[in-house]
Amino acid sequence: MAPTMFRPLLVDIGLSLSDIGWLLGIVATIANMLGGIVAGLLIAPLGRKRSLIVFSSLWTLSMMTYLLPAFGVTNLPVLYLVACAAFLTIGMMTTATFTIMMDKSTLESPGTDYTVQSSVGTMGSIGAAAISGVVAGAIGYRGVFALSGAIALISVIIIAKVFDTDKSSAT
């Protein structure tokens, strides 16, 4: 929900469409790609489970920086820092997630297995995006960002407790 509501927040605080396009479409997207590269270099030495926990924790922390503009800290350097931190860590977390999804795919039907896993993740993202505006209308930007952070933290705790490294091709 948080990433979906960040763009409307930027509109509401008065950024121009050009500023938003540059911030999210160019700079933050480059940060996302760099996050994927960094994660790709770190997954083997850290292992899959540790990578997913560390990168998801970093994403949770960076997501909470969305609260800065929600509380009125809206100067451009802060907005760039917030967007870049969030997109960098999303790139890291996504790379770890996709690596594990590939590990969990069987040799008999890897394309189908990966596609099903990816589709479930995409449907979850679409569902969260679909309700984010309604939730924001009810509890505001601050509430959405805090709730998203709480959900992300719970997810990290579940990953740490439930993730089974024995069933992955690499730990």
Predicted feature locations:
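Loop-to-transmembrane helix entry/capping segments in MFS-fold secondary transporters
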Residues: 17-18, 107-117
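Helix-to-loop junctions at the C-terminal end of transmembrane segments
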Residues: 34-51, 136-137
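C-terminal ends and interior cores of transmembrane alpha-helices
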Residues: 57-74
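Hydrophobic core of transmembrane alpha-helices in multi-pass small-molecule transporters
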Residues: 76-93
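Intracellular juxtamembrane helix-capping segments at the cytosolic ends
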Residues: 91-106
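A membrane-interface helix-boundary motif in multi-pass transporters
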Residues: 134-152
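Multi-pass alpha-helical transporter architecture, strongest
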Residues: 147-171
